[in-house]
Amino acid sequence: MFPRFTAARVQEALTDTRVVLLTGPRQAGKTTLAQSLADEGRAYVTLDNATTLAAAKADPTGFVRNLDRAVIDEIQRAPELLLAIKESVDVDARPGRFLLTGSANLMTLPRVADSLAGRMESVRLLPLAQAEITAAGPPDFFVRIFAGQPPTSIRSIIGTGLVEAVLSGGYPEALTRKSWGRRQDWYLDYIDAVVQRDVRDIAAVDQLDRMPRLLRVLAEHSGQLINHTGIGAAIGLNHVTTQRYTAIFEQLYLIQTLPPWHSNALKRLTKTPKLHFLDSGLLGALRGVTPERVVQDRRIFGSILESFVVSELMKLAGWSGERLSFSQYRDKDQNEVDVVIEDRQGRIIGVEVKAAASVNAADFRGLKRLKEATGDKFEMGLVLYDHDRAVPFGDRLWAAPISCLFA
């Protein structure tokens, strides 16, 4: 069993919050984590069981009334329970009454956010990070960077090792498969399961058969500014339907759109979000990319690596305890920064991702523009690259190993 650094945050939330919602994509490890907490005096019920699900839907109030402290797995399958849970915790306001898990972002549903406002904390569990896979301990990346200290890496993963780590992804079940063919077969079967089960749970979709095809087209655009019209045209969907279906995949934690960073002082910034997949193994499987193909053509690896870094940064942010916002920078002169991270004090980190083993001054062009735009708020700009050395490139500008995110 892999260590999950999110566990400490969940346990802390259960000490002072009536309802804790653990959300993330199917098969990311939510059930395993929840079951470990169910051993601590909590009943465990799963709505993946047909009989249990039928009982919950038939009489939500009676179902919840019979539970004192409980873990309810896959809550998105019976959202009717949420109002009954609200009524229960309003009567008995002890912290840690309910730990819910869900394979969809229920907080995007107005009735959920309204009914449990002030009563529930939401914690996201994404697929395994590299630090969890290697059991290296939670990295102190954000602590160091916001303190103005250069990034360090105590475990060098470069070249072929980096490619294999990225394309393996972070789903625990996929990592048990020994061959690349078997691993990618798991990912493709996973997509079918998500479409047939999770999509049906949260949305009425008229053209369900288009969803796997749409996800493959989205995979080809990961790391790019999203164009719903162009993406939809590839599979015969209009702009509105494509946007709606894409939002469903985001609600299921398969993809993430990064909004553009904006400033009232700058008028020449693009306003289009950027698309990323939250698991690079899934992304690689949808594109049919293997380590052997990367050896033949390194160019196919760049955008997959960028999405991988975005996901790793989001996982680190989830453990850090800081509320960090993620965006991306791009101006009309084509200067860009892959990831802009801002804390509650307005301090900013810029991250650019390079699949190459060398970096030059030109790679910092976008970061320098961001630095000019943010002034004293600019904490550090990083170009993360495929090497094991951190190299300074000017005031608060560094080239650093991608593996500084791992340990």
Go through each PLM region and give its residues.
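Pre-Walker A adenine-sensing motif
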Residues: 1-14
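Accessory nucleic acid-recognition modules appended to NTPase machines
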Residues: 175-348
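Interdomain motor-coupling "hinge/lid" segment immediately C-terminal to the ATP-binding subdomain
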Residues: 105, 110-220, 224
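Conserved lysine of the Walker
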Residues: 30
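Conserved catalytic/switch belt of AAA+ P-loop NTPases
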Residues: 82-100, 104-106, 113-115
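Hydrophobic anchor at the beta1->P-loop junction of P-loop NTPases
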Residues: 22
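Domain-level recognition of nuclease-like catalytic cores that cleave nucleotide substrates
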Residues: 386-407
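Hydrophobic positions on the alpha1 helix immediately C-terminal to the Walker A/P-loop
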Residues: 33, 37
